[in-house]
Design a protein with these regions (language model features):
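Beta-strand-rich N-terminal accessory domains
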Residues: 1-67
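Short helix/loop capping segments that flank catalytic or ligand/cofactor-binding pockets
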Residues: 23-26, 36-39, 44-48, 82-85, ...
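Catalytic and substrate-binding clefts that recognize carbohydrates or anionic sugar/phosphate headgroups
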Residues: 42-44, 48-100, 173, 228
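Polysaccharide-binding surfaces and accessory modules of carbohydrate-active proteins
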Residues: 62-63, 68, 108-110, 124-229
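Extended, loop-rich substrate-binding clefts of extracytoplasmic carbohydrate-active enzymes
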Residues: 78-131, 223-244
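A surface-exposed beta-strand-loop module
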Residues: 243-255
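Conserved small/polar residues in nucleotide/adenosyl-binding loops
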Residues: 255-262
């Protein structure tokens, strides 16, 4: 069964059937900052070593597979419906929505079309800077103005893989989060000068720094409470599990061609 094809011109492998029987991963970064991401945006990022300097979390052998990840959610504020640019974690029916993944040379692009909205999310790590860039583009292909909210989400690691998985009585107090001027900062209390951050090139309309506040009780990345409600809660704390979620409300106007013939 064929799930994709090579795009020789762009030097990409294009996965246009995303319900793969196993994970198809790509490696980002060529120097100190690296990431491993799969065809549905699941994966993690690390600095130099994935054992001692993980930036974002990953749960090996998890169900559903390859969680968590580096996700972007879109919410239609007219009816409360929401989806993710990558097929997972929301997992809209493939009969209702179209998804693609493009694995390139040290970058990956996720594409979706749903309810007259086409969107893309490109993950890449530049050679000169130890950062992961999320390039998100949204286009209104429908015949009406659209009121949307866009949410980012990644789950921060405590840096050491053992701390992420053992002795929660201690590890839940080894990091804290804060928010100021559009920047989420995650501080590691047991590492001198240890911190990581999440920000964007826009003024956010909301944020969440706490994973359990963004996701909500008895929920998963499939149906986060902040996305369902349409508003992040502004959470932060000196302890607990932390995430990077920034919210941006946008109005997508109708597309008009500069040519009167179109």
């Amino acid at each position: 069964m064929q799930y994709g094809h090579f795009d020789n011109e762009k030097r990409e492998y294009v996965i246009d059937r995303v319900d793969l029987p196993a994970s198809w991963t790509n490696y980002l970064g060529l120097k100190d900052m690296c990431a491993v991401v799969n065809h549905t945006a699941g994966g993690y990022m690390f600095y130099k070593t994935p054992e001692y300097h993980r930036i974002t979390r990953f749960r090996g052998n998890s169900i559903p597979m390859d969680r968590p990840g580096h996700y972007v959610y879109i919410r239609d504020n007219s009816d409360g419906d929401y989806w993710s640019i990558s097929w997972q974690p929301v997992g809209k029916s493939l009969e209702e929505a179209a998804y693609r993944c493009r694995h390139g040379m040290s970058y990956t692009v996720y594409e979706s079309e749903y309810k007259g909205i086409s969107a893309s999310q490109k993950l890449s790590i530049p050679l000169q800077d130890p950062v992961e860039l999320w390039d998100v583009k949204i286009k209104n292909d429908s015949d009406r103005k659209r009121d949307l909210s866009v949410f980012s989400y990644c789950e921060f690691s405590f840096h050491h893989i053992m701390t992420d998985n053992q002795n929660f009585q201690m590890s839940m107090y080894c990091a804290g989060s804060s928010y100021e001027d559009g920047i989420i900062e995650h501080d590691l209390f047991y590492e001198e000068f240890g911190f990581q951050y999440f920000t964007g090139n826009f003024e956010p309309d909301g944020f969440d720094c706490l994973r359990d506040k963004f996701i909500g009780p008895y929920r998963t990345e499939d149906n986060p409470l902040s996305v369902e409600k349409g508003q992040c809660g502004g959470s932060f704390e000196l302890g607990n599990n932390h995430c990077g979620s920034l919210q941006k409300n946008i109005t997508c106007l109708l597309y008009t061609s500069p040519s009167p013939r179109d």
